[in-house]
Amino acid sequence: MTDQELIARAREMQKYAYVPYSRFPVGAALECDDGTVYTGCNVENASYGACICAERTALVKAISDGRRKGFTRIAVVGNSAGFCQPCGICRQMLSEFAPDLEILAADASGRISRHSLRELLPESFGSDALENSSNG
């Protein structure tokens, strides 16, 4: 799948976003090494802590479908003039399953920003930190 096709899949998801508070629809498309694509949109709630971002929606759909590895890249789109990069929580969630993930963020005009997850979340907290901890 080309970058543009993956971004188009993410843009398609924006129409499903539930964003009565921010009015900022975000779409995401998470691609796997076998070509499978899991999509997601952001879903807001009056209790703001209960909101979920598009990136995590796509990841949770993949996990609930039995996928645990093989994620290669994710496209993230919003309607702003700037790039819609994954938030810190999304970066942390994605790093649990795909530390080498490529992130494509597209702005409203179609420009693409390309980064590795390791660039956006250097020295991330992971399961290895828990394995090396002393609990008492």
Which sequence ranges carry the predicted segments?
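Feature captures the catalytic cores and cofactor-binding loops of soluble hydro-lyases/lyases
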Residues: T57, K61-D65, Q92
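Small residues (Ala/Gly/Ser/Thr
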Residues: A10, G27-A28, G40, A58, ...
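Short beta-strand scaffold segments in enzyme catalytic cores
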Residues: R23-C32
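Phosphate-handling active-site elements
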Residues: T36-V37, S64-F71
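C-terminal binding/interaction regions
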Residues: T2-V19, K69-G136
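C-terminal structural segment of proteins
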Residues: V37, N42-E44, P86, R91
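Short acidic/polar mixed-charge low-complexity motifs
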Residues: D34-T36, R111
